[in-house]
Amino acid sequence: MRLIACSAVVLGLVVCSKAFAADASHIVKTEARKQGVPVAFALKMARIESGIKCGQRNPRSTASGPLQVLKSTARAMGYRGDIRRASCATQAHYGMKHLAMCYRGARGNQALAKRCHQVGVSVLYSKKNRKKRRG
């Protein structure tokens, strides 16, 4: 009897986590369309950064949300407040805003846009990557 009750609870949690993942996926897709980022690329980045989870936080930095946006990056993109306490939609908005800036700066080069999002905008202006941006 106890084992069945535990299974039902565990099953309920699994179903809930899938529902949250579907919501996060929908939020990421919506923001990608708004910001002009290819949806497949945006989902790939969210999967790499957080497994497409809204509540994901990096314990060693201020990164949080589906695109793991840093507090300083969110501020640079115009957010005021603590990004770690913001809603999933807000975190996705500012993370996607940064990813879109990287994507445009890389002129559609997804590998370079990925590096820019993960490392920083200075990647776009290094001598090594100037040729990639021209192409």
Spans of features found by a protein language model:
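Positively charged n-region of N-terminal signal peptides that target proteins for export
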Residues: 1-5
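Cleavable N-terminal signal peptides
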Residues: 7-9, 19
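Generic marker of residues within folded, mature protein domains
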Residues: 9-11, 59
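N-terminal signal peptide c-region/cleavage motif recognized by signal peptidases
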Residues: 14-18
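Catalytic glycan-binding domains that act on GlcNAc-containing polysaccharides
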Residues: 20-135
